[in-house]
Amino acid sequence: MAGAVSAVDQPLKIITGADDFGASLKDAMVTHLRSLGIDVEDTGVSSYYSAGSEVGRRVSASSSSEVRGLVCCGTGVGVAMFANKFPGVYAATCLSVEDAVNARSISNCNVLAFSGIKTSPETALEIFDAWIKTPFKSPCPASGSEPWSSVISSFLDNSLSEMSQIGKSTAGDSTTKKIDETTASCVICCLAKNREFTPVDIMPGGSMKIVRETPTSAIVRFKAGSVEPAHHHTFGHDLVVIKGKKSVWNLSKKERADLVDGDYLFTPAGDVHRVKYHEDTEFFITWDGHWDIFLDEDLETAKKAIEEEA
């Protein structure tokens, strides 16, 4: 692929993701960036909201300013919207070099969003090159290609610390009621102890309590020996095991995860997965959108498959 991108001087890692409409452009960029020696962490292809949120989550969780993101969907707008749901992520859809320079200069953009429909690989390289080389507060089209005035420069300096706090949880003041540490050590456990659980009819042995409707979050319990037949969801989900032991087979990726107390697992949207509970297990789960479930096999088929693997 032809293009103007040159090797980056400083250590740099780019986390990438796309939906079906942006997959080809994303793959082309991944191949080229790796050829330049840039460390690329590719999260693959999923729905635009899952792709954007997964890249945003990983960039947000990084402690390094040199970890950035690159996301692609049909328009470049959807992936940017969901990447921006995470603190410290400043995603911008850039259709031109000018967009990229403005986004870096003004907003310190750290996630670049491309349109797989509108942007060619050659143009994407030019946009990326401008984006990666433009420092914060540098002259840009919005400044008339001149240095920012001292007033605006001061504003931009202050904006970094102020923007980074948006979306973060804030500590309560002196009037906030404190949790009694003698009865509960974490908020999730406190919620679980004081809520009624509803049986999950489609999953024998399971019960759940929804603690937020949209995006859906819930505390879920399964009895030892329970099996979740292969199924999938419209939205990806994160879960943390509070107590117990379970095995999750991601049939889409042909991977297995054995989880115990404190373990975390993310399952992308649409991935078909099967679950076996080895002990009474309780976990917290949150979806990227509204909860739903679609079965891909019956219970007996699932049990037989697990027995054959054992």
Curated annotation (Swiss-Prot):
Keywords assigned by UniProt, alphabetized: Acetylation, DNA damage, DNA repair
GO terms for cellular component: cytoplasm; cytosol; nucleus
N-acetylalanine: residues bearing it: A2
Cited SUPFAM superfamilies: Ribose/Galactose isomerase RpiB/AlsB, RmlC-like cupins
GO molecular-function term, one example from the UniProt record: isomerase activity
Residues of the Cupin type-2 domain: 219-282
InterPro entries in UniProt: ChrR-like_cupin_dom, DRT102, RmlC-like_jellyroll, RmlC_Cupin_sf, RpiB_LacA_LacB, RpiB_LacA_LacB_sf
Superkingdom per UniProt: Eukaryota
A biological process term (GO) from this entry: carbohydrate metabolic process
PANTHER family tied to this protein: DNA DAMAGE-REPAIR_TOLERATION PROTEIN DRT102 (PTHR30345:SF0), RIBOSE-5-PHOSPHATE ISOMERASE B (PTHR30345)
Designated name of the protein: DNA damage-repair/toleration protein DRT102
Originating organism: Arabidopsis thaliana
UniProt gene name: DRT102
